[in-house]
Each structure stands twice: as C-alpha cells, then as structure tokens.
C-alpha cells in the first residue's frame, strides 16, 4: 500500500493525510553538570520528611485502609503524595524516612508480638518517584518487620527503582546540579548516643574523602509524643554538627 500526500503552494495538504507533527524530545539534564545561578552560585532546594509508611499492617485482619484507598483510587500510584507531589517534584532533592518494607516475605519471628508490622507489595515502590521522593533513610524500627530477607528485598527493590537508600554502614551518594551529596543514617535505640558520638565523625570524614560537597546525617531518635529533643539528642546533634555535617535531620 502506497500513501501519497499532495501539498499546494502554501504547504497545505490538498490530497492525502496530514503528516503527524514532529515531537521535539525534552532535553535531559545531566545531574553531574553544575547549574549556575546568575551570580555564579548553585542553588539547591531540598525537602526532608519524617516517617513514611505505605502498604499494610500485617498484624491487622482484613483489608487495610491503605489498600482500600488504593482500590478506591483505581490503583492510581499518585494518591499517597497527591497533596504535596507538586512541591516535591519541583525541588532538587527529597528525602524521607521509609518506615516499612517492600517485600513478599513473612513476619520476622522475633517481632510476632508487635502491634504494628508494616509490609508493602514491592510494586508500590513506584509511588515514591511518582510522588517526588529521590532518596530514603532505612534506619528505623520497622525495616526489620519482615526479617533480614525482607530488608534485603526492600533494598534491592529501591535500587531497581533508582532510589538510593542510606543505612548504617551504607551511605547514599547522589549528584545533583553537579553537587555531590552524601547521606548517612542511624537509629539511637538502646541508648547508642555516646557510641554514635564516637562513630559518626569518621563516617562523615569518609564521605568527604570521597569528594562529597554536602554531608547530610539523618537520625531516627527521640520518644513518641515528645515535642522537644532530649539532652542526649542535643548532645549527639551538636557533636554531629561539630564533626562537619552540613545538615542534621
């Protein structure tokens, strides 16, 4: 079959089909290249959020509130962040504390008596970049809800989705607008404040040695329903700043 299109002297189609307009692809931005402001500086807008949980509490029977809402939204992966996604997509870096798991593994046998054990289907990971989340911390009291194998699947799932994670001993390193950013994450359960005061400076220096321009240190700390940091948090936070951290969150 031969398709013939005839144009008049003005370039209008007189016979045949109007050709599809050419689509100019959006230019891709290389994150390793610096983006300068008019004054020669580099401006980075970062957003940090606290505990973020998707999926279900497997200790509860029946369909979870999250699953019911997802069904109501006809599987729309944008619904968890719909009220803030415009903000998170517009910034340069969004980091959250991912408090849960992305796994098909069963309960951690050491935590069967816990009231809350969080698990999300690995496919739900797509909700994070859809909502503007760029990187996560995995230091909290729910990452082991489905045991060591559940945590490992969570890590692999995040990386496969292009989301770097920070966990103790596993810093996340990202480059944004040519700025190399290192992220460290810790939890303080069991009164580890003095241990971390001794440990964290070396971890910060290790990221500096790798060429990080900015070092972010994230702690999962404090007590529920407390509105102010306790003395141990203040000591650890101050020691972290003194050790060279640019941001403590």
Predicted ranges, named:
Residues 13-15:
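Short linear proline/tyrosine/threonine-rich motifs used for host-factor recruitment
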């Amino acid at each position: 079959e031969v398709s013939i299109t005839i144009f008049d002297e003005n370039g209008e189609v007189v016979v045949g089909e109007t050709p599809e307009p050419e689509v100019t692809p959006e230019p891709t931005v290389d994150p390793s290249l610096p983006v300068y402001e008019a004054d020669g500086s580099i401006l980075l807008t970062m957003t940090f959020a606290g505990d973020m949980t998707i999926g279900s509490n497997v200790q509860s029977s029946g369909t979870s509130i999250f699953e019911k809402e997802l069904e109501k939204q006809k599987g729309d992966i944008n619904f968890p962040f719909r009220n803030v996604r415009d903000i998170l997509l517009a910034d340069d870096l969004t980091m959250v504390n991912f408090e849960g798991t992305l796994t098909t593994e069963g309960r951690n046998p050491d935590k069967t008596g816990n009231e809350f054990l969080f698990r999300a289907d690995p496919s739900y990971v797509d909700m994070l970049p859809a909502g503007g989340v760029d990187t996560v911390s995995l230091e909290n009291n729910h990452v082991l809800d489905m045991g060591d194998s559940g945590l490992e699947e969570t890590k692999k799932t995040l990386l496969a989705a292009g989301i770097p994670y920070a966990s103790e001993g596993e810093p996340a390193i990202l480059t944004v607008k040519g700025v190399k950013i290192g992220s460290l994450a810790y939890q303080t359960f069991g009164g580890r404040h003095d241990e971390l005061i001794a440990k964290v400076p070396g971890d910060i220096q290790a990221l500096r040695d790798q060429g990080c321009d900015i070092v972010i240190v994230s702690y999962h700390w404090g007590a529920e329903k407390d509105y102010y940091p306790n003395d141990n948090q203040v000591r650890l936070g101050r020691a972290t700043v003194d050790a060279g951290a640019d941001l403590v969150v």
